[in-house]
Amino acid sequence: KEIGDWVHASGFRRLFIINTHVTNFAPLRCALEMLRAEHDSFMVAVINSASISQRVREQHFHDADDWHANDAETSLMMAVSPSMVREELIAESDDEDRTENCVFSHPVNRTSTNGVTGKPSLASREKGERLFAWMVEDLSAIVRRGMKEESPLPHAYNESI
């Protein structure tokens, strides 16, 4: 929120926040709501990297709904930061998604035997390069669209309708 305040005070009227970690979404959304209430002319977007577009979302979720270190994430890391990938562990690391019928959200250590949910064994550097290119292309399109967007209706934040 403080960064958003600074961005607004610097004269910017649009802020695009790209979230790349699933548990950061809730506090980022709270910051968006506070910024919107405080700065009427400030437009803030929180964009989750795994849901930038339909094709990006399909790649992230194809092997698990509650994924963690799965095919998509492992492929991305193989492409952009290969030194952080322990390739010798990949073939043995697949772990099923155990959250299908859960009512509550559980931490990874209660849903995975090894910190993985999904199939990192399917990962490759080539898939990661393709996915990263899609993410850049699709996010760029969102930002270009957002740079032109105006509110659908002209009401001030605190104005009653």
Regions from the PLM with identified roles:
Residues 1-15, 20-161:
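Extended, histidine- and acidic-residue-enriched regions that form the cofactor-binding/catalytic faces
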